[in-house]
Amino acid sequence: MAIIRHFGMVLLLMMAATKSLAQDQKQIFIYCPNERAGLHIAQQTEAGWQEIGQLCSSDYGTWGAEKRMYHPSVARAADGSWRLVFQVNDKSPMLAVAYSKDLINWRPQDYPIMSTRQCLSPVVFPNDNGTFDIYYKTKGGDKRWVSASADFRRFSKDEASQIGDAAWIRNTITIDGKEVDGSLFDITSTELQAITSHFDRQAKDWKICQERMHNDKKDSPVNIPTPITASLKVSGQEKPISDKLIGIFFEDISYAADGGLYAELIQNRDFEYIPKDHRGWSATTSWSGSKPVVVISVDPLSENNPHYAVLGNDTIYNEGWDGIAVTAGAKYDFSMFVRNIPAPQGKSKLKKDFVISLITEDGSVIAQAKVKTQGADWRKYEAVLTATQTCEKTRLAVAGLKDEKAGIDIVSLFPRETFMGRKNGLRKDLAQVIADLKPKFVRFPGGCMSHGQGLENIYHWNHTVGPLQDRKPDFNIWGYHQTRGLGFFEYFQFCEDIGAEPLPVLAAGVPCQNSSNNRQGIGGQQGGIPMKDMPAYIQELLDLIDWANGDPATSKWAKMRADAGHPKPFNLKYIGIGNEDIISTVFEERYEMICKAIRAKYPDIKICGTVGPFHTPSADYLEGWDFTKKHPDLQYMVDEHYYESTGWFMHHRDYYDNYDRNSAKVYLGEYAASTDAKRPNVETALAEALYLTDIERNGDIVEMTSYAPMLAKDGHHNWNPDMIYFSNTEVRPTPAYETQRLFSVYGGDRYVASELKINVTHESGSSEKPTFAHRLGASVVRNSKTGKTYLKVINALPEPLILNVEGLTIPAGTKAIGFDGLPEDQQVVLKTEETTGKSLTLPPYSIRVIEL
């Protein structure tokens, strides 16, 4: 009966293409121009078919190789809602499905898994009971069928089907001279108007967001007086706002950890590099020798680090991270684990001496020490190297004396001077620049690195604590290796050292939606952690809280923390679950399980959820907030991410004005403004500063913010722009860094209401804001603990600003701190000036902060 019913539906659809339409009905065509273009809609006009725009695109799998939509099929339910199915590729055992009420906003895609590796050309049909039937073909030409629930979230096991080929008959139209296949539908004029209005709004928004400060010379905002005069009326009315607005987000991206903040100078110290870390890498990457470097795994130091090198009467060299930079007179702590290997004849003395050296590019030895070892068991040996000259690029030499064989592992070299003098510590200059931000919290360890490249690469915090040799290394989603030397103990310790709240963020039971296909051909979220394994994963997250806050006398996890040198609890208050995930059914099921378990055992812990990788009106944002509001008891706040143009930030300064104050708080966890230069400059920093004045104004709903990414090492950029760039010998904060520092150091917990009024006379006599008002900003906050008040003023225009301040007493000689420059300047220097009283003068493209 199903075969007859659906064949009849196909005929009815074809007849609908030629029937005369009622006056209120409009005809649309839904199609896919090509596999990279996504789902499009066109309307019938007197001049023929006219393109309206893209409805949605594929979210499946990796960028580049995937994210393609093949053979989409669309059906409309009796209630007027829509269903979409499409083929993701020709090798994965899954279909892509999506739901929409209005063709404008689509729920995030789900990817139900089928029984065959080829799920080709799917088609979908509605049933009278509200469910849907989906048919697809296999590579061999077989046909299979699956039933979908009315909400398009539940799918039966697929079965063989005998449905006829007529089910795959498509409509064809010509648009822009090209013939395309798709589906015809009748919708009402009101529905069509809503769709076209949506695309009109998108086009207008896109146009205004193209505004750039660096274009001011040739396309200056109209009617700007010289100078600009304005008044700021401070009313004195206050409201409480978050005292944690400005923090930092640390992710091991662009060599931010190993080779960066983590002070270890030896690369591949554990001989555990593999091709999965990076194509072409092996256990000997960054090592070389006077003879071929021998690596074995018999009787290893640790099962988590099974490989080690074997030395006889030879020398091996390590290149470090683009070389090893040393300073004359500085001390460097060397260590390695050694086991002397018995000779086959049993005559070995089980003793071996080593000479450890730092060697310059011209072969000069500028530091040297001798290490004597004995015994067949693994043992740690240490030495101190003192550099006799400064050199940006040395290499480490480990020379074995005589012929006896010995295994060496975890070959390490740290500067004696680490941040706060910590063992296994952080690079002092880089950590200090971060500390100078005075961040109120630190989000770690990611980012995409938290949920990982596939299920096997999900970040497990418990693999990163304990003795270094027992920590479990892994590949990094950003294309290199994680030693885990910078682990959760070091993250928490750093937070404590700089007075910031720790905010660990871990996976919500799903990997990154951009994951490549696994052995079964399943990519993206890969179906999530199997439900049978979720209790163990949830326990792992509960153990983290126990490790951070528990009593060493009663908790094995807390005892591990105490054994590492921190008997007192870390006083963890926040935990993040998920990172810019697709808010799919697979995600929601696992996220809810995790949150309920944490809330049940640790009700005081504040959970931070996620609403996807982009702002409104993205599918994940809408679904994420809908889920959050339907489950208000699960989370304290949600994490929003968006990277946008400077024009977007300047024209969306009211973004949080209408957020529901009774709903979850907002953590703007990743954001940055950018221009075509793809580097932070004065333009991006001022756009971010303008936006942050409105974040402060909305600090009653926005709890936290953090710029992203924070760190990038020269020559290893996975992403641009970044807040801080660095090499082995220098740290280069950007204008974005200075904006973050000004808003953090001069932050408060009370917002003081004020009104900025620009003095412009309109020819019409109207009182409308001038068209350049979005380029000026001001904010007043007060720190209730210190009693200090801070005024921030931003002038993102090419003319000077004279601002008269009313309601605040600014004594003559009061210091104003800030920066200015040309929009394209990528380096700025903070300057301090004296004010002349209640009138402030700001140069073009500038920010000033006054402390009262």
What is the predicted role of each segment?
Residues 771-810, 845-849:
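Carbohydrate-binding surface patches
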Residues 21-223:
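Carbohydrate-active catalytic/glycan-binding domains of CAZyme proteins
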